[in-house]
């Protein structure tokens, strides 16, 4: 990974006339803009289909893509939808936000129409996709079709025969729900087709894609339903223990995530085959992967199932470096960003260092006056080169919102570090972005909202809350020429410019000959 810069913007946050960011013309225009702004990377959030709460970190599958990302414009061009049909659908009235309720009610009927008009059963490309991805697609498509048949309830509430995947039940539902299953396969085919076209365009224009995979999978997922042996489940396929975080200075109860925990002894016996397959597949979709909650590979927090808080949990040992040695032997060296934030011990630091993966630094964590002063790991003078610096992540306040919310003494600490006691408070975000850009971190990634100077009304997610998360998106027109030039200049000034996209200033041989003549 060369010294460079990137921008964090979820696919959902792209502007769109149809209610949510997707693989439409806006995505290609954003790639063009990244190129003009001197960027090398576009970081996104997990691509999977979201469940209740709309979090991309709680997905129905670790392999499937979110059908909401399928471009309706592309389906119109293909002739399987009309512009009138799409314009008549109600996706919500606010251009800068996402109405997931209306999205569910309007998007799927349109996608179903597109499927019914596509005649995919005679499409060789579709048939090849289904065959090549049968190892995960078959279970996922059946899972989604059965879930729809049971009114969307979790698989743990399905009828006993299909809940436990008895052979006769699997055969029955595959016959009974044939067209619903084919519809789900069609959605994944279109997702993959459009995503690969977008990725190819980005790579052709010098932009690499940073994907994101959660360490855990959702209990209500095709993965747990189809492969209960991978997880800490009891005889009824219910969790024995679930994931979360212990109490800390921010939460007296800790965080209860509820994801099933892995049976790491079983994974070790199989040579981590499921994990290797998961990572290999994810690297087909993205150039670099950020692995969420990396500290969970060193130690993970185990909470007895049924607890209402995380107070009674305890730490257990994870697979450690063994998993990543197996990964490298199977896949070769891959570019990973280790999300090593939160409660970090010396053991976690050793794992990150031993893996060789860059860890993460977040400027918003650097100026807490209750913390370790100048020894704070997140202060730029303490960075090593092999790290990725962010002003904030999707889980943090925007940098402007953070400046507005921190205590007075922390704000003074910011000004002291910047040697800036006179700039208006509303302009400090630019100084913090510049500080991140000039740090020795190999890669600097800035959330789009921070470059735009937006406050917390444009925050992506507030952990441990529900309701207004994952909804923000660009309206269109915000990425002005002035902003483009400012970001390009920052990249050039601090040695992060993507030179592969810069026009050469050296004349070619024909031009030189013409000058001589």
List where the protein language model places each region.
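Surface-exposed amphipathic alpha-helices with a cationic face
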Residues: 35, 195-205, 328, 352-353
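Trp/Phe/Arg-rich N-terminal binding region typifying the photolyase-homology
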Residues: 1-80
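Outer-envelope exported proteins of Gram-negative bacteria
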Residues: 45, 208-210, 214, 288, ...
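Conserved, well-ordered alpha-helix/loop/beta-strand core segments that scaffold catalytic motifs
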Residues: 184, 188-217
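Conserved alpha-helical elements of sugar-nucleotide-dependent glycosyltransferases
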Residues: 26-27, 194, 323
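In a subset of proteins, long, contiguous C-terminal domains/tails are tracked
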Residues: 454-517
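Alpha-amylase-like alpha-glycosidases and glucanotransferases acting on alpha-linked glucans and related
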Residues: 10, 16, 54-188, 217-445, ...
